[in-house]
Regions:
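Extended, helix-rich architectural segments
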Residues: 1-150, 462, 478-484
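Extended, compositionally biased alpha-helical segments that mediate assembly or anchoring
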Residues: 435-484
Length: 484
């Protein structure tokens, strides 16, 4: 069994990477990266279904050797990615500045044109499989073809062919981003980016290109967590055990059907046995009255119910460790909505998703720094990073009725500010936006009500609205007006 404990972070103590030391830094980094690459490749093949059970060998009755892959690794990654990235990541303006809000809307339009939602999904796939992923952003040379074209291009890199080298100083800043390709002639071509330089190096350690650049390091790492552990990496022994048990169950059924025959006190030749297998019957007699002849099957059937209990227990453990909901949970007439959410593990799934959000946002801010710089240099979009907030828009429908009741109760309490009600009811992914939209809607409704009232009573009096009231200027109504 392969022991996997997360990916290694690549460090260098070089203060500045130059033509004189870039090859040395690359060689040392590549040695560590190749270890990571071998593990990532193993995890990726495991995710696709190429798992150790397919290569098992049996010494006893090797002709009965079923290999069953229950690809729970694929299930774990698919759920995690779907739950985290089911809805596109959005950029939201901080504050009430309309100019900033319009610029952020334009930034979201840029991301839509670049199909960033699909590329975020690719990033999340690699993060949950390999424990880390990489994104690259470069200026788009054809960005002026259309006005709404994003001035930058976004790429999702294969973590088996890319890595980032960090410094050992305080904060471990990124020193160099590397991606490489295998050419048809078998040569490896490395593209190395530092903060102010670009190098192109072959695996013969010749620097083919060396030129200055002002963009910075366009390769950003998106680790899944600090240990860079994949989503199913920590339960690999359990997943292998489930495969083994399921394969052995099929072996047990097949061995029961193809049971061995026991000949007790029966003298049988090879030809007689072949005839038995072909005809399905045999004639024999006792050798001696005291030595009874007997032919029977050697059978020992596997207890399927106990085996299923073992499989269910291991699967439940996998779900608990990975923070996934149990879709086969029991039910009770006394369960409340909150109890079901807690019991079936949906609260744990949400907690893990929020943990992944924090790691994603940290790297996404580095990506935004480069993106906003490109948009400023090549376009007319001027935005500060501090004016943009990254929002995950997962649909928050769990226990929605109870949350709505809490919101109504808090809004009806005159001692609670409405903004606090929106923030703490748990109903909205972005309480501030929901509050602002609701306040604008309430003002619009008040304005419409005033306009409707003024149209119904253009003179501003109350007489026409009262039962039996008369129009102004007639009868007693006019007299009372004169007295006033």
């Amino acid at each position: 069994m392969k022991l996997l404990c997360g990916r290694r972070v690549i460090y260098t103590d070089v203060e500045e990477i130059t033509d004189g030391n870039v090859v040395s830094v690359l060689q040392k980094a590549l040695a560590i990266h190749l270890q990571n690459r071998a593990e990532i490749d193993y995890l990726y093949r495991y995710y696709k279904g190429d798992q150790p059970i397919l290569y098992r060998r049996k010494e006893v009755r090797p002709e009965i050797n079923n290999t069953v892959v229950e690809n729970r690794a694929n299930e774990i990654v698919s759920f995690k990615v779907g739950y985290l990235m089911g809805e596109p990541v959005q950029y939201v303006a901080r504050g009430d500045d309309k100019a900033v809000a319009e610029s952020v809307t334009r930034l979201n339009d840029y991301m839509l044109s670049e199909d960033k939602a699909a590329k975020d999904k690719e990033l999340a796939d690699w993060s949950h499989i390999a424990g880390t992923s990489y994104r690259m952003v470069l200026p788009d040379g054809e960005a002026n073809v259309e006005e709404d074209e994003c001035p930058a291009e976004i790429f999702t890199l294969d973590p088996r062919y890319s890595f980032v080298v960090y410094g050992t100083s305080l904060g471990t800043p990124a020193k160099m981003g590397v991606k490489y390709v295998l050419l048809e002639d078998g040569t490896l071509l490395f593209s190395c980016y530092t903060h102010n330089h670009f190098f192109e190096i072959t695996n013969t350690w010749n620097i083919q290109r060396s030129e200055e650049q002002i963009l910075g390091i366009p390769i950003i790492e998106y680790p899944a967590n600090n240990a860079r552990l994949g989503a199913f990496e920590i339960v690999l022994p359990l997943l292998d055990a489930i495969n083994t048990v399921e394969s052995n169950r099929l072996d047990g059924v097949e061995q029961f059907i193809q049971a061995l025959m026991l000949f007790h006190n029966v003298d049988i030749t090879s030809e007689d046995y072949k005839e038995l297998r072909e005809e399905g019957a045999i004639k024999f007699k006792d050798i001696d009255p005291s030595l009874k002849a007997e032919i029977q099957y050697l059978t020992a059937e596997l207890n399927q119910s106990q085996t299923q209990t073992l499989v269910d227990d291991m699967y439940d453990t996998v779900l608990t460790i990975c923070g996934m909901p149990n879709r086969n949970g029991g039910s009770s007439t006394s369960d409340t909505g909150s109890a079901v959410i807690m019991r079936d593990g949906w609260s744990a799934a949400e907690a893990r998703a929020k943990d992944s959000e924090l790691m994603f946002k940290k790297s996404e801010k580095e990506f935004l720094k480069l993106l906003l710089r490109i948009c400023s240099d090549l376009g007319d979009l001027e935005l500060k990073l501090s004016a943009v907030e990254i929002r995950f828009t997962r649909r928050n429908y769990e226990n929605i009725t109870e949350k709505a009741n809490v919101l109504i109760a808090m809004l009806n309490n005159s001692k609670i500010a409405p903004q606090l009600a929106f923030t703490h009811c748990g109903m909205f992914t972005d309480p501030q936006i929901a509050y602002n939209m609701s306040m604008e809607y309430a003002k619009e409704q008040e304005q419409k009500a005033l306009e409707l009232a003024s149209r119904q009573n253009p003179d501003g009096g109350n007489g026409g609205n009262e039962p039996g009231g008369q129009k102004s200027g007639s009868g007693d109504t006019g007299g009372s007006s004169d007295d006033e």
